[in-house]
Amino acid sequence: MDIMRSVVGMVVLLAIAFLLSVNKKSISLRTVGAALLLQIAIGGIMLYFPPGKWAVEQAALGIHKVMSYSDAGSAFIFGSLVGPKMDVLFDGAGFIFAFRVLPAIIFVTALISLLYYIGVMGLLIRILGSIFQKALNISKIESFVAVTTIFLGQNEIPAIVKPFIDRMNRNELFTAICSGMASIAGSMMIGYAGMGVPIDYLLAASLMAIPSGILFARILSTATEPSQVTFENLSFSETPPKSIIEAAANGAMTGLKIAAGVATVVMAFVAIIALINGIIGGVGGWFGFANVSLESIFGYVLAPLAWIMGVDWSDANLAGSLIGQKLAINEFVAYLNFSPYLQTSGTLDVKTIAIISFALCGFANFGSIGVVVGAFSAISPKRAPEIAQLGLRALAAATLSNLMSATIAGFFIGLA
């Protein structure tokens, strides 16, 4: 029954996308079918197929090992505020977001910048981009951007496509925006893992987001124009560093900006949510609903969607609430509120944890529309009106992409 519910959930998400399509007759079944099959295949290999699961587990262990090295830099600055002594002092509650998550973001961003400089990232993106281009029958620029989103966030993508944006057709531009919203950057992945989200789920979600973002981009905005973009040399930075030291330093400074942005937004939004909940609870108290909150409203509204995706009804309210928070606020706040449920074993079953982890794994939220429109418009002012028109539709495509990955994850976890 649970397996069939997951299958129905996939069909429902595809049906929603079809209803939102601007040109239903021009949908490429070749690309859409290949993207869906590839997304399912990636999910199956990484979550169900024993050798694939083993490989993901080993990769997760490796990432955790790399993450542990960030504590050396954190401890040098913050001393005993980082490490097991804090857990002893506060009886297991010594995890301090500012000292554990934010430094990891800075460290990993510097590491990614260094790997770009020595050519590792470029080679990997070229190989994966070529595979996805041929498998999905899409243009080179689309596959290039989609694969790049594994490592870079939606803030960096506009700089990457800057040399080509004026030659990109409307559908390529839409796909680039969708791919950025549907994914997470490598540095942010480490931040989420630092809050207890299983790293193997984050890895699988990042890879599944590549075909999934293209899948829903192609349904909501069908490709009707030939690609005009041709290039030989791909650049990953507007001003390439001159040395490995400069690459690491530039990456660290970029990481600092990201970490500062994350801290600022999280502080502001957590406070705003508390204010809204205070107002809602106060007004609700006049009518006998003193316990009503923004989270509970999201939960009631989106619980049926969470259930059709495969979450047990007993947990559907929580899942719906977190999905709503991710969409209306951002994924970091949603993961922050999800984190306590991950710290206590037995609170949620494995399948529910997987579905929620996948559903929240993406930049698709209303705030991202402003980020994307502002960033892309800055590098191509003449296309600003066109980019603004694509924002809301891209958010819908990216959200459906994340939910599809979550539903597929629930399907394979249910089979295991």
List the predicted regions and their residue ranges.
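Alpha-helical membrane segments and immediately flanking helix-loop junctions
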Residues: 135-193, 320-408
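Long, contiguous bundles of hydrophobic transmembrane helices that form the permeation core
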Residues: 207-258
